[in-house]
Amino acid sequence: MKIILVGCGKVGTALARQLSEEGHNVTVIDTNKARVEHISESYDVMGITGNGSSIITLSEAGIEEADVFIAVTGSDELNLLCCMFAKKAGHCHAIARVRNPSYSHELDFIKKQIGISAIINPEMAAAREISHLLRFPGASKIDTFAEGRVRLIKFTLTEAQALDGVAIREIPTRLKSDILVCAVERDGGVIIPNGNFVLRTGDQVTFLATQEKAHEFFQRIHLAVRPVRNALIVGGGAIAFYLSQELLENHVRVRIVERDPARCDVLAQALPDAQILCEDGSNREFLLSEGLTSTEAFVALTNIDEENVLLTLFAKKHSNGKLVTKINRLEFDDILAGLDLGSIVYPKYMTCDYIVQYVRALQNEAGSNIKTLYRILDDRVEALEFTVHEKSRATGVPLSQLHLKKNLLLCCITRGNEIKIPRGGDEIQVGDNVIVVTLEHGLHDLRDIVED
């Protein structure tokens, strides 16, 4: 597909890399010549220095033949303007990143009036993910499928869970738990396990289950399942605003530490039920005086990654609460993984995942659309949800007879209101939603899960 991408910041760079690696014809546009040259030299993309809202620049990029137009500059208004001009000049799908909370209640109206295909708000998505984690604090990562009915949950296996030396096939009978272990991180590697795989203390385990079954499983292995009742948030940006709204609706006591007095005034008016503390969040004595040692959740949401890391490490030393750390930069995730920062949230990853999912779905509107896509475990594993529209070599055949690709696990089939962890005798049918976890990147269609 021919894709035009406006904005060569961190998200734009990550998207250019991912989309070009998947074989798309990508053209990037940015007013910063150095950024354009860096991306065009680093990846197989064409670069144009110019204004993405200029019809001349768009024509030079080939907007008339473009299939997809993506605007991820630092300005919401510019992103919307670029998409509006792109829709007028071409016949493409247009995707805009819009982050300002002022637009949060107007996104559907904006999409309809401008004709934008999709709008992604990474701050709102990050807040939703953090909210899920605070409602299920024993998990370090939660991704949702099937309109939230199915969850992919990650946790660290400790001696307290009594699962050391247990084979995966023994879990349903030993713990009376209807869950499916989908991936295990061990010694720096990732494994898609079979039933004979034996768990060890220290493993990072990712499993799939409904919310109810996950709750039962965590109770049986003595992991926290009670939602937090109070949260201390450092940093009063957009994510803190969206998160506080969700938490307050669920009767969670919220305190926000923000150093900017003007921002504190805005938050106090927008969130009258939250306690706004106008103070430097890096002031350790202040955090301790405000109950850091007793808080049930500590969330570091400043705009500086290094500050968030240090804040979380300090909180870990003084608190037994749930820890959540926001990280903006994508290039240091392998280093951060060794610091035990609790749950790490990457808003920029969320933007990339959503757009890649959207583009892949466009390529397979006939066979089976990708409904949901997550790149998990440090981008080494893809978890995908397909909607099956027509018969193929993957449908109507017992799973035991399907020759699935290596390092791929078919985890779940949803059929209407039925949610099923499939067995060998089950079949995929037209109309099903199918969830797959794989080490292979770039699957576009359900047919791709079967060996040629």
What spans do the regions from the language model cover?
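Cytosolic regulatory regions of ion transport systems
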Residues: 1-452
